[in-house]
From Swiss-Prot:
Phosphoprotein found in the keyword field: yes
Family label: Belongs to the serpin family. Ov-serpin subfamily.
InterPro entries given in the database record: Serpin_CS (IPR023795), Serpin_dom (IPR023796), Serpin_fam (IPR000215), Serpin_sf (IPR036186), Serpin_sf_1 (IPR042178), Serpin_sf_2 (IPR042185)
GO CC, one annotated term: extracellular space
Positions of post-translational Phosphoserine modification: 69, 345
Purpose of the protein: Storage protein of egg white. Lack protease inhibitory activity.
Single GO term (MF): serine-type endopeptidase inhibitor activity
Recorded name of the encoding gene: SERPINB14
Predominant location: secreted
Glycan attachment sites: 293, 312
Protein name as annotated: Ovalbumin
Amino acid sequence: MGSIGAASMEFCFDVFKELKVHHANDNMLYSPFAILSTLAMVFLGAKDSTRTQINKVVHFDKLPGFGDSIEAQCGTSVNVHSSLRDILNQITKQNDAYSFSLASRLYAQETYTVVPEYLQCVKELYRGGLESVNFQTAADQARGLINAWVESQTNGIIRNILQPSSVDSQTAMVLVNAIAFKGLWEKAFKAEDTQTIPFRVTEQESKPVQMMYQIGSFKVASMASEKMKILELPFASGTMSMLVLLPDDVSGLEQLESIISFEKLTEWTSSSIMEERKVKVYLPRMKMEEKYNLTSLLMAMGITDLFSSSANLSGISSVGSLKISQAVHAAHAEINEAGRDVVGSAEAGVDATEEFRADHPFLFCVKHIETNAILLFGRCVSP
């Protein structure tokens, strides 16, 4: 499964580079893994250059066994699709330690007859699968149905994923992908230690935030040449952790963003660099929700045929004109004090001299520990 982690990490930073262009100074939050798994679902039915483009952009071409025939993909358990399914099952199963809900589905205009093997395959491997709806004569009704499904799958958190103008009678197929996350820390922050303090948005501007605090032993690294620190905070599930990448300077985010990559993050978080130390941690409470037009994002990254009349999705439907008319991604994350074990901050070791104070813009990600797959990636410029 490790190779999926590498693909999701590489894809993560490709997406980040593209999003940065249009969201230079905004908060950002998205799930590389969720987008990747949805594209894997499309990839199963894509042919020719449509398939080649997805392959290249999502780095599927680097994963052994990914391009096998549709029968093999559904019939064998030792391939990448079932590995993706295994990670999806692991992270979305009911769990007291976190809630991680994923809504991912294709909605096709009902006049496109769907290949039965494809339907069976995506149902088996990707729970959302494909639904047929009537965009042609009841587009607004179809939109309401899609929005209601996403809302129910994310426990009421992500609403109105499709805006009124996003579908019409010409819509052929829509891809929706949404993720909502709330985690319990392995070591809780005590609510009474949370204080209102200024978060320095820029050198000139600050805003009051709820800053959580605890002293504990965590994996940290100080990177002098990159002028930043990294902290890893485990979630109670034992399967996920959060990495916080904090520039030394208030205005240091731009420099960090210009050098960060799959290779760099792998190097910085390696066991030879990160070490467990006692540290005073200051982290703001966060509640973030962002929505992105995947159509323009993926087209800018090189997946162009899928959204045009050049699309070849004959593995999904034999009707030649099928393409994706609209693709949307939404992500929501809530980070607060809640955790499994409460460590008394005062007595937890007054000897901690090292400080990790996230009181200015930083990057963060939630990763699946076993595979290194990036489940969420975010930029916090204003909590």
